[in-house]
């Protein structure tokens, strides 16, 4: 009983909110067998046909290529593209591609040679003999991307789900009106669908494998049931027809009952989904070594006399396929790539088929109906009821029109699957999906600009930091070079410090002058040099202190100890210098010229007399009658002070003026000197007499 209940539970089908039931319009092409499209005169292969960056070119203009030969290099999430047939590359230039913007992208133009000659192939009949890494690499190098419309690199998707997938879902719903590519593929290649599913099971090791298909495809259901005989691990689930049940989140909810959170993918709940066409491409890449160079494309619409499904090479122009289907242009032809709800109108019929092109719709004016003008939103709420993603289309519309990008992002704009259900039910004929696509593109552009700005800012800040480090290092080198002393400079400083210490020790000693010899000024000169050397040493210490980084972690007691040690070392060095230089004795003095010493002494005496005379003339001479009125003690003191000043002035004059030769000495008047000396003696005698008269014994 429990087993029956469990089996019944496995067959449960859930439903999702929203959705619509538009006319299916599938019988125009689903009852016609698939045809192989002929090669056009020129194939135009865009380099980017998937999500992610385009690959690096590995061919050049004028080069001959073989069928299946890679045209670009595939690294990481970059999927390579391949030559759809053998021929010559006539150009590598921009061309309009299958995109709503109608912008030109870089494409490889190949002129077929008609031979359709393959490159060397290496089929793997038994994939179970290969490890998973080799299988994933082969899928990647085959250029396989999601053929259901997203274009996500299949190998990257499988790599991310190797250890986290519990449920593998094969999407065979194909819910959009007019499109029957997967329907015819399952009818005619059901065995390849099953074999590709088994390869995925070998890679992912899922606990459950489900194939979801709508109940409006009875022929495909019968073909799959026949191919799945004996494959109990693969379960075929037939679901009700409802648009958009083929969406990844919607089909996950229908088959498992699990809802994918906002902003997440099905892989976040352990579910991995692959399209039927992608599964067949995986089988052909692994077993047959055929890269993705062709796919099934539905050509339908009342403007075609022979609608159906075609195996079309990647790069085939749309106009070439339309001609094969009997295209009859209207007055204002409209060709849509994709379905009527999720497709877009082509700006040019020279646009090539790419990996995600599943349908080309060529309707007549009557079929599409008259285009009604867009009107104001009446806030009816029908779009909210129809949205299968649980969004608020009305609010997203206002945010998109008002360019309120952050509000649109916060209202989960990127969870919109662009199914068109909201626009289908809108009574105001508002093209809501177009607004959402434009808003998404603007947000992506702003994000890219912000990312580039952040990268530029990071580079600028890194450059500024590097320049600052280089500046600090350069200044430090300059400071170190400025304070670096050579050996000679160090010796000079030490010698000057030693002389200064020697002079300090001999401050009480007098300078001896030997008669007939010039005075020894070496001590004065040495002191002056020592002071200069000491000043230079202080400057050096200041520079060294400035060059070293400041720190507050130095102990003041340690600093005091270091200073004391430095003073002791300096005193020892000065004493050693003093002991190393012998002091000259007085016996060495007679080596100087005695005549020069005599001349210097005579000049000193003459200058002293002149100074005394000048002092006498500057003060008025008092008469003898006035003398008794003065205080003799003050006069004696004044005379003594005058003599001292005269002696100091004479000594200063002697030091400041150069020593004159013998020939210059007789030029002074000896009589004036004698008069001055006599006057000085008279004043002294008067002062003495006055002092004795005032103070008798």
UniProtKB/Swiss-Prot annotation:
Its main location: membrane. Binds 2 [4Fe-4S] clusters per subunit. Residues 581-596, 619-634, 657-672 have a biased composition (Basic and acidic residues). Keywords: 4Fe-4S, Cell inner membrane, Cell membrane, Electron transport, Iron, Iron-sulfur, Membrane, Metal-binding, Repeat, Translocase, Transport. Residues 576-674 are annotated as: Disordered. Its EC number is 7.-.-.-. GO terms for cellular component: plasma membrane. One of its GO terms (molecular function) is metal ion binding. It is a peripheral membrane protein. The keyword Membrane applies. [4Fe-4S] cluster 1 binds at residues 377, 380, 383, 426. It comes from the Bacteria. InterPro entries: 4Fe4S_Fe-S-bd, 4Fe4S_Fe_S_CS, Ion_transpt_RnfC/RsxC, Nuo51_FMN-bd, Nuo51_FMN-bd_sf, RnfC_N, Soluble_ligand-bd. Its cofactor is [4Fe-4S] cluster. Part of a membrane-bound complex that couples electron transfer with translocation of ions across the membrane. The complex is composed of six subunits: RnfA, RnfB, RnfC, RnfD, RnfE and RnfG. Belongs to the 4Fe4S bacterial-type ferredoxin family. RnfC subfamily. This is Ion-translocating oxidoreductase complex subunit C. It comes from Yersinia enterocolitica serotype O:8 / biotype 1B (strain NCTC 13174 / 8081). The lineage of its organism: Bacteria, Pseudomonadati, Pseudomonadota, Gammaproteobacteria, Enterobacterales.
């Amino acid at each position: 009983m429990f087993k029956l209940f469990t089996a019944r539970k496995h067959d449960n089908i859930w439903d999702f909110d929203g959705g619509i039931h538009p006319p299916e319009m599938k019988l125009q092409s689903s009852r016609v067998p698939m045809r192989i499209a002929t090669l056009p005169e020129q194939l135009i292969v865009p380099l980017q046909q998937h999500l992610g960056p385009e690959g690096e070119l590995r061919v050049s203009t004028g080069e001959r290529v073989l069928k299946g030969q890679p045209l670009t290099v595939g690294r990481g999430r970059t999927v390579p593209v391949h030559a759809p047939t053998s021929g010559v590359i006539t150009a590598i230039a921009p061309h309009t591609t299958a995109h709503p913007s109608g912008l030109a992208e870089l494409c490889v133009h190949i002129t077929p040679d008609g031979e359709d000659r393959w490159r060397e192939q290496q089929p793997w009949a038994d994939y179970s003999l290969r490890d998973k890494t080799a299988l994933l690499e082969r899928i990647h190098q085959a250029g396989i991307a999601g053929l259901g419309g997203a274009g996500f690199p299949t190998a990257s998707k499988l790599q991310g789900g190797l250890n986290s997938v519990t449920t593998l879902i094969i999407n065979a719903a194909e819910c959009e009106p007019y499109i029957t590519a997967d329907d015819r593929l399952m009818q005619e290649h059901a065995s390849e669908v099953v074999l590709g599913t088994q390869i995925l099971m070998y890679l992912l090791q899922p606990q459950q494998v489900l194939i979801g298909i709508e109940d409006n495809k009875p022929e495909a259901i019968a073909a799959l049931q026949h191919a799945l005989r004996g494959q109990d691990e693969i379960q075929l689930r037939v679901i009700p027809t409802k648009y958009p049940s083929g969406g990844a989140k919607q089909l996950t909810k229908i088959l498992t009952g699990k809802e994918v959170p906002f902003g997440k993918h099905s892989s976040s709940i352990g579910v991995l989904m692959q399209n039927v066409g992608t599964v067949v491409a995986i089988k052909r890449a692994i077993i047959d070594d055929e890269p993705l160079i062709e796919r099934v494309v539905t050509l339908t619409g009342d403007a075609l006399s022979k609608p159906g499904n075609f195996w079309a090479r990647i790069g085939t122009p749309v106009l070439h396929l339309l001609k094969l289907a009997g295209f009859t242009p209207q007055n204002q032809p409209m060709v849509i790539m994709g379905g009527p709800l999720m497709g877009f109108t082509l700006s040019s019929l020279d646009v090539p088929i790419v990996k995600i092109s599943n349908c080309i719709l060529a309707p007549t004016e009557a079929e599409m109906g008259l285009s009604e003008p867009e009107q104001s939103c009446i806030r009816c709420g029908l779009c909210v009821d129809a949205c299968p993603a649980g969004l608020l289309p009305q609010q997203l519309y206002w945010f998109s029109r008002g360019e309120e990008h952050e509000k649109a992002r916060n209202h989960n704009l990127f969870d919109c699957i662009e199914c068109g259900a909201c626009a289908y039910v809108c009574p105001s004929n508002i093209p809501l999906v177009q607004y959402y696509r434009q808003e998404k593109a603007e947000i992506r552009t702003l994000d890219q600009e912000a990312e580039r700005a952040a990268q530029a800012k990071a580079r600028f800040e890194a450059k500024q930091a590097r320049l600052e480090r280089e500046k600090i290092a350069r200044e430090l080198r300059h400071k170190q070079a400025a304070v670096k002393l050579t050996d000679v400079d160090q010796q000079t400083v030490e010698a000057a410090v030693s002389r200064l210490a020697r002079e300090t020790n001999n401050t009480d000693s007098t300078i001896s002058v030997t008669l007939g010899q010039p005075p020894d000024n070496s001590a004065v000169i040495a002191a002056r040099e020592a002071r200069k050397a000491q000043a230079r040493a202080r400057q050096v210490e200041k520079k060294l202190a400035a060059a070293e980084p400041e720190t507050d972690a130095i102990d003041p007691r340690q600093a005091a100890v270091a200073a004391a040690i430095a003073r002791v070392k300096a005193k020892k060095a000065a004493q050693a210098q003093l002991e190393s230089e012998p002091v000259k004795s007085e016996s060495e003095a007679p080596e100087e010229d005695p005549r020069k010493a005599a001349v210097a002494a005579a000049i000193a005496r003459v200058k002293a007399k002149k100074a005394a005379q000048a002092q006498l003339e500057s003060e008025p001479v008092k008469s003898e009658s006035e003398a008794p009125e003065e205080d003799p003690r003050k006069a004696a003191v004044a005379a003594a002070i005058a003599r001292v000043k005269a002696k100091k002035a004479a000594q200063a004059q002697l030091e400041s003026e150069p020593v004159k030769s013998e020939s210059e000495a007789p030029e002074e008047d000896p009589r004036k000197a004698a008069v001055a000396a006599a006057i000085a003696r008279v004043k002294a005698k008067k002062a003495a007499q006055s002092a004795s008269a005032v103070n008798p014994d």
